């Protein structure tokens, strides 16, 4: 059984049989770790062991983040994939801290702040909008690209999408129409691609917090197990 499957099974055990607080922590960790797959990243065994201590209540989330930071600072034997694992470990711990809170600042500033918090200690440009145009080739589009917004228009575009969503009323619409509307909002926000890196993970975390805040019970399974599918669906939805 590969390491990825083993990680999922361990967290599933907590979710099935653990105390309520342990279930919640395990579900959040599962989501945070699963989201790293959108960039082909995998967490280390050390992160998994440290996450378990947090789930068991032995340490708090800030201690987790400090332990992960110290682990990589003090590591004497470097491995080829250490940089990628370090990113995955730190970002997973950061996302876990964010998703452990029930509050969200549903604004452009709040969205940008999520990027800063998710990538704190990882990217120098965390919390900064890109100041150049980007294109990305996508294998799912046979090497073609999605059209990302010009950098000059980024702030205005985020403002517009969030204000449109803020003005929308979910009252009286069917479940299917709710899903369509939410999908359109999340997809549109992602297409702006305001950051140099980390757009999918930032958008996913922001969406989870927002949906919780308006009373939706968010099933984290999509992000925990199928984050690569989530990203590819966003790419396809924005392909013209």
Task: Map each language-model feature to its residues.
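FIC/Doc superfamily catalytic core
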Residues: 1-240
């Amino acid at each position: 059984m590969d390491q990825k499957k083993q990680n999922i099974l361990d967290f599933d055990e907590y979710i099935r049989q653990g105390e309520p607080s342990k279930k919640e922590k395990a579900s959040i960790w599962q989501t945070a770790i699963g989201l790293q797959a959108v960039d082909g990243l995998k967490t280390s065994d050390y992160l998994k062991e440290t996450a378990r201590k947090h789930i068991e209540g032995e340490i708090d989330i800030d201690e987790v983040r400090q332990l992960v930071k110290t682990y990589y600072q003090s590591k004497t034997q470097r491995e080829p994939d250490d940089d990628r694992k370090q990113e995955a470990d730190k970002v997973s711990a950061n996302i876990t801290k964010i998703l452990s809170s029930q509050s969200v600042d549903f604004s452009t500033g709040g969205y940008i702040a999520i990027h800063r918090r998710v990538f704190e200690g990882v990217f120098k440009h965390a919390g900064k909008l890109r100041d150049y145009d980007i294109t990305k080739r996508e294998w799912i589009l046979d090497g073609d690209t999605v059209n990302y917004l010009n950098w000059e228009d980024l702030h205005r575009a985020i403002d517009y999408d969030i204000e449109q969503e803020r003005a929308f009323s979910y009252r009286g619409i069917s479940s299917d129409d709710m899903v369509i509307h939410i999908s359109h909002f999340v997809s549109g926000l992602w297409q702006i691609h305001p950051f140099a890196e980390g757009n999918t993970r930032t958008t996913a975390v922001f969406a989870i917090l927002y949906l919780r805040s308006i009373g939706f019970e968010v099933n984290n399974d999509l992000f925990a197990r199928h984050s690569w599918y989530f990203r590819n669906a966003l790419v396809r939805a924005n392909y013209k």
